[in-house]
Amino acid sequence: MGIHSTINLPEAYTDLDQTLNSADLILSDAVANATTLFHTPVVSSIKGKEVVSRVMVLREFNLANKMMRFHTDYRAAKIKHFTENNNVSVIGYDPDLKIQIKLQGKIRVHHDDGVTELAWKESNGRSKKCYSIKDGSTKEILEPSDYDIQDFEVEDGYENFAVLIFNFNTLEFLYLKSSGHRRAIHRWEDDLKSTWLVP
């Protein structure tokens, strides 16, 4: 379909199930496939009356459990945002696929528990190194090199490691095509309800 992905997607969407199945394939592939832009979706949250957005690496996607997993530094400002208001939107778009996927739901912060222990064990040394920096991300510094790590123990970074579990209740799928765009939304209330939308 696109130069960045080997997954097989429909050339046209005529059935609602196709849109949900394609979203599942795309996001499942994106967990390990860093060449697709869905590997780094935009996660938006609320800070007071402001919307705050950041790009994050997708670590896990599970459609059956309506779940996404992200990793972050527990000292980061976003932790407070998520704690005070856990309503979150996640959106990704890949121009090669001409597909946008938007999800809405709630996010939970895990720190120093079974969830973080398992995720930490599965993380590689390069990823763990990021959490060994003396200060958390977005802290003001005088020089650009003031955050550089010199001597550190990789495992010491665990105390700064946090896992974000995002449980979505809506998934919106948009496919752009000159012959006719297609947009669908899937909502999980008591049961799954799906419908087409005007693109």
Task: Give a label for each model feature.
Residues 48, 63-64, 97, 178-179, ...:
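Short strand-connecting beta-turns/loops that link adjacent beta-strands
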Residues 42-44, 89-91, 165:
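Residue-level detector of beta-strand face positions
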Residues 46, 73, 93, 167-169:
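Structured loops at beta-to-helix junctions and adjacent beta-edge loops in soluble globular domains
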Residues 34-36, 93-94, 132-133:
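A short, aromatic/hydrophobic, helix- or strand-capping loop or linear motif
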Residues 39, 54, 86, 159-162, ...:
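Short beta-strand or tight-loop elements
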Residues 7-65, 69, 80:
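An N-terminal domain-cap segment
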